[in-house]
Amino acid sequence: MGFMRVKRTCLFSIILLSESLLGPPIAIAENPNYSTEVFKFKSVSRGKERPVIAQIWVPTNSKGPHPVIVTQHGAGRDGLIFADGEGRTDEYSSRIIKNGIERGFVVAALDAFFENDIQPRDKKKFPNAYRYALDLKKILASDIRFDNGNIFYTGFSFGAAQVGKSFDIQYASDAKPWRAVAAAEPGCNAFPEPIKATFPVLIIKGSESHYYLEPCQHFIKMLRKAGNLVTFLLIKGANHFFSTDGRITRGVAVNGCRFNPLIRMQIGGWRFADGSKATRRLFIDKCFTNEGGSGRNREHLNKVIREVINFFESNRS
């Protein structure tokens, strides 16, 4: 069908249009160790249909069906650009991709901000990207190249918050649940009253994060009380970006409900942890702050990536 020029990255250069079991992809890139496909699909966020773009990397040096990692970017997409030049992801997912391929996983990265000029400061505009991940999982599970009994989910920051939604009762009817999930640096200022899931969760926090530990401790306590298997890892000396050069700066963050996080109740509605009723207005007034964080030498990030992939590997069926 011809060739397509794209912005070159360190991962690929030649793009060939083709078709696969996923439907007509935008592009397929060839590499001695993996092939990759970029494709678009429709999903829903807060009642509105949205376009989503995703890229998958498939190892070619091992036989399938392959286990799959779905990875979700944070608020800043500061990592690799997709092969088509449109979608992109963050540094966390970029390293999950590289290391996941080396360990024999298919890795699928989705861009939840596709065709929207959403910046890290635009937190009130962030979509409900967990639905995007579920729809992507459904697409991947239908492809015979992939092991639909071993599909994993991870994300950083905003992406980690989406991972937390996998314990929300509104998604309990998910026909093919994740094999395991991992949340890297979730903020935990708003989370669902958790149900008991069939899969374990790994939660990783930095001890010096401006998204403080206390609300995540509350979430972990509730997860365990519901009967979930939770592994918690605290990275000493690491900030939100798993770096050692962190400092507090001025910037929009959802970290004001450190000691009284917002909880989406199983019976419906929202309440603060102290039992008081919550509204969107109260959530914005109490939980949104100008206390941001910076410092991105990422000294601890490779350790985090190894822990996540090791966790997934140890939970394969």
Predicted regions and their residues:
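Short beta-strand/loop motif that positions the catalytic acidic residue
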Residues: I203-K205
